[in-house]
Amino acid sequence: MPSKKSSSPLSVEKLHRSEPLELNGATLFEGDALSVLRRLPSGSVRCIVTSPPYWGLRDYGIDEQIGLESSMTQFLNRLVTIFSEAKRVLTDDGTLWVNIGDGYTSGNRGYRAPDKKNPARAMAVRPDTPEGLKPKDLIGIPWRLAFALQEDGWYLRSDIVWNKPNAMPESVKDRPTRSHEFLFMLTKSEKYYYDWEAVREEKDSGGFRNRRTVWNVNTKPFAGAHFATFPTELIRPCILASTKPGDYVLDPFFGSGTVGVVCQQEDRQYVGIELNPEYVDIAVNRLQGEDTNVIRIAAA
């Protein structure tokens, strides 16, 4: 493996795509999720917490990006393939937590008008109405993905409603304003590690109870990014319930690195994979410390 650069507390290494990857502490890989996953050791992470790019939301201008597939079926199939490889990397008693948003059919409209204040939003796209749906239909992406993963062999164990008390208003007047997303808990095996006491809730009458499936978590903007980020308090229960200190947590769509932030706070190791080099830089700035390696996957 190439020697580490010493100009930064974060090491930057160039690897060829054919080389197998080893985990040695918290690591951030810059590269395509599926390509990196295929080179990670089997059974090496205890938990996966992630939020894939939403379908048809925006174009990040990056080759191999997810979310711009021409059909919903292609999008879902691609995610199933990625999570199938992630399952191999997961321990037999490991868990997968997936947050993904929904959307409405567009009536086959094209790109949105440019937005000078938010370039990422300027490239938001409206894919064609999926076959079998009508204009203005709620697409149902979260549940379609959950059922597709279940069909692929995952155990679908829980659907958590992420309720957003500070949800952004919408201009629509012919339906309620959306204020929630889904977070699915899936497992690789019938029996798995889950520490319910680590995430128990206080009862109004005193004492504690098992955590319920509606989580009230405010969205929080991150100043360094022009896109939505995972709230730390949405991620924390997933990690605490599914891992022990020192375990590895994987996020194959690392974004700004919030999973890594929570892992640092909770004494877990993390493995992040992020395709967009701008987001890698954002994550690096958030995670500055000698415990993090940044490995940039060479194109060759």
Curated annotation (Swiss-Prot):
Q: What class of enzyme is it?
A: transferase
What biological process terms from GO does the record include?
DNA restriction-modification system; methylation
Name the InterPro entries on file: DNA_methylase_N4/N6, MeTrfase_CN4_CS, RM_Methyltransferase, SAM-dependent_MTases_sf
| Region of interest called Disordered, as start-end residue ranges on this chain | 109-129
Question: Any idea which GO molecular function terms this record carries?
Answer: DNA binding; N-methyltransferase activity; site-specific DNA-methyltransferase (cytosine-N4-specific) activity
The UniProt entry's sequence similarity note says: Belongs to the N(4)/N(6)-methyltransferase family. N(4) subfamily.
Q: What is this protein called?
A: Type II methyltransferase M.Cfr9I
